[in-house]
């Protein structure tokens, strides 16, 4: 079967299309292994849907399923448009709900599913944290210096609150830098779309930024976020790195 290796702002994915849904947890662990497989943060499988352009199955590299992945959804839209010959304007179903996207060559913009479960700020380990769900749960702490990012603290917070963990530095009211520890990967990743979305929304909610800003994750790639009627849109580059055949048996 043919698969495609994708990169989107620092996150990488293995993507292929199939005719039916089924459990691919073990396959995800094999394909995403960076030493014995292809290597990726996640596996995306595109399957048909009778109402929308397609539906996806998303697996983290540890084989666990995730309802949503922001950069993964941009990669999926790029794949569907360029390789499955779908429209530039796409509606597709994820575990977090309907995602709308627009593909313009290698720039892809998506509208995240609605923001929910907004938490009151709280203190933990001498830091102020706040959480929300932008498709998957995130916890955010705003810092003066991103070198304060503490991988051991992230592991502790992730386990305690069962959420992705983000450290965010507001450079000015139009620019944020973000570092993210992701569930399922169980490590810091080069980027996380839903994590950046959570940082953007909580910064906006606390009057730290405007409603249209630039965010740079650890990969240092530029992503642009805007808020319209309580909906988060974000766009950035997507790259198909290569395609190849793989024996999935």
UniProtKB/Swiss-Prot annotation:
Question: What sections of the sequence does the record tag as coiled-coil?
Answer: none
Q: Where is this site: Could be important to modulate the pK values of the two catalytic cysteine residues?
A: 138, 182
Known EC number: 5.1.1.7
Work out whether the entry's keyword set contains Amino-acid biosynthesis.
yes
> Which keywords annotate this record?
Amino-acid biosynthesis, Cytoplasm, Isomerase, Lysine biosynthesis
Q: Which GO terms describe its molecular function?
A: diaminopimelate epimerase activity
Query: Which SUPFAM superfamilies does the UniProt entry name for this protein?
Result: Diaminopimelate epimerase-like (SSF54506)
Instruction: Choose any GO biological process term that the UniProt entry carries and state it.
Output: lysine biosynthetic process via diaminopimelate
Compartmental location: Cytoplasm
Residues where substrate binds: 11, 60, 70-71, 164, 182-183, 193-194
Catalysed reactions, semicolon-separated: (2S,6S)-2,6-diaminopimelate = meso-2,6-diaminopimelate
Q: In which pathway does it act?
A: Amino-acid biosynthesis; L-lysine biosynthesis via DAP pathway; DL-2,6-diaminopimelate from LL-2,6-diaminopimelate: step 1/1
Q: Which InterPro entries match?
A: DAP_epimerase_AS, DAP_epimerase_DapF
**GO CC terms:** cytosol
Q: What is its main location?
A: cytoplasm
Q: What class of enzyme is it?
A: isomerase
Q: Which residues form the active site?
A: 69 (proton donor), 192 (proton acceptor)
Subunit details: Homodimer.
Q: Which PANTHER family match?
A: DIAMINOPIMELATE EPIMERASE, DIAMINOPIMELATE EPIMERASE, CHLOROPLASTIC
Q: What does this protein do?
A: Catalyzes the stereoinversion of LL-2,6-diaminopimelate (L,L-DAP) to meso-diaminopimelate (meso-DAP), a precursor of L-lysine and an essential component of the bacterial peptidoglycan.
HAMAP family per UniProt: DAP_epimerase (MF_00197)
Which family is this sequence assigned to?
Belongs to the diaminopimelate epimerase family.
The name this protein carries in UniProt is Diaminopimelate epimerase
Q: Which organism is it from?
A: Campylobacter lari (strain RM2100 / D67 / ATCC BAA-1060)
Its taxonomic path starts at: Bacteria, Pseudomonadati, Campylobacterota, Epsilonproteobacteria, Campylobacterales
